[in-house]
């Protein structure tokens, strides 16, 4: 459970990622399936002080943890620049749970939401 009801993201267990990502959502035509793509520019997880192997992205809030293993590093001029995590949902309940995390994360980080028209 998250302390103080603050939602957070971790790439290393017990270490919060301070860089706030750009988050893009897409949903399937049936409205049940979809994905959220998190793009972190110059995340601390890729810094020289980071220690260990990234095995996934943990989204943690007061309800618990959502885990995805879909994490990629993108390089620019040979240097790690972006970390991209993708969470895929296959049911409405998975989507609803993700949206509760997303709303909590937005509140914890002073973020807003805009819908693409």
Swiss-Prot record:
Bilayer topology: Peripheral membrane protein
Protein's UniProt name: Photosystem II reaction center Psb28 protein
Locations listed in the record: Cellular thylakoid membrane
HAMAP family to which the protein is assigned, alphabetical: PSII_Psb28
Gene Ontology cellular component terms for the protein in this record: photosystem II oxygen evolving complex; plasma membrane-derived thylakoid membrane
GO biological process, one term: photosynthesis
Family: Belongs to the Psb28 family.
Subunit structure: Part of the photosystem II complex.
Species of the source: Prochlorococcus marinus subsp. pastoris (strain CCMP1986 / NIES-2087 / MED4)
UniProt cross-references to InterPro entries, sorted A to Z: Psb28_c1_sf, PSII_Psb28_class-1
Entry keywords, A to Z: Membrane, Photosynthesis, Photosystem II, Thylakoid
Principal location class: membrane
